[in-house]
Amino acid sequence: MRDVKYVDAHCHIEDKAFNKNRDEVIERAKKEDVIIVTSGASLGGCLRALELRKKYNIYLTLGYHPSRVKADDKVIEKVYNLIKNNEYEILAIGEIGMDIKDENYKRQEEIFKKFLSLAEELNKPIVVHARGFERKIFDIAKDKVDIMFHCYSGDVELAKEIGKEGHLISISTLVCFSEHHKKLVESLDLEYLTTETDSPYLSPIKGTKNEPKNVKLVIEEIAKIKEMEVEEVKDVIYKNTCKFFKRRL
């Protein structure tokens, strides 16, 4: 079987948490043959992500996190225009979506639909943050664009429906220690999945920041659960992710 790379389909290498060691983190990922897709989720994060793409030749998505909906409309409009003006630099729009833990669901939905319309206009897939709103987000967007459910934590039956409809479930480093996420992997066809770290969050190693190289642990855990070879899992995940982003990575 040909040698393929690991894919961290969603992380935040532009996060300020990496300011002191970003070079080393990216170098460690490259040494482990990890493809990095970083996700700008605020105005500042999107601007930093664009700069990092130029410097490190990594991939990116740009969006606006639902936790930031209290921001002034002018800020949201700046992010909107930034995405529109950099459509050829991005793989997808995201992360965007809704979160049950944040307030003002109506405004969250309005902002999500604004960026969803932009994705339709630009013919881009979306990467969604949908904690507590998995069904709602799916019903709104499923017939409009391709969807990747970042760090999916919803129920198994909805995940199966998402996969059968041709959308993608992203399995994060939570699978290394969460029984629910192990059950998701056990229950879902591998063709429905991609992998991520959500770095610097969700570290599988206690007391450390997460980083893209740890996506290897996700692949290894999936292989263990599925009773498959690591290389076979890598290959399928890579193909799934390239298909979703509509390009070879």
UniProtKB/Swiss-Prot annotation:
* Cofactor: binding comment: Binds 2 divalent metal cations per subunit.
Among its keywords, does the record have Hydrolase? yes
Which CDD domains does the UniProt entry name for this protein? Answer: TatD_DNAse
Q: Which residues are a divalent metal cation 1-binding? A: 10, 12, 95, 198
Q: Which cofactor does it need?
A: a divalent metal cation
EC number from the UniProt entry: 3.1.-.-
The GO terms this record gives for MF are: DNA nuclease activity; metal ion binding
Keyword tags: Hydrolase, Metal-binding
Please report a single Pfam family linked to this protein: TatD_DNase
In this chain, a divalent metal cation 2 is annotated as bound at 95, 129, 150
Looking at the keywords, is Cell membrane present? no
Determine the domain of life of the protein's source. Archaea
Q: Which PANTHER family does its entry note?
A: HYDROLASE OF PHP SUPERFAMILY-RELATED PROTEIN, HYDROLASE, TATD FAMILY
Q: Which family does it belong to?
A: Belongs to the metallo-dependent hydrolases superfamily. TatD-type hydrolase family.
Q: Which NCBIfam families match?
A: YchF/TatD family DNA exonuclease (TIGR00010)
- Full protein name: Uncharacterized metal-dependent hydrolase MJ1582
Which organism is this entry from? Methanocaldococcus jannaschii (strain ATCC 43067 / DSM 2661 / JAL-1 / JCM 10045 / NBRC 100440) (Methanococcus jannaschii)
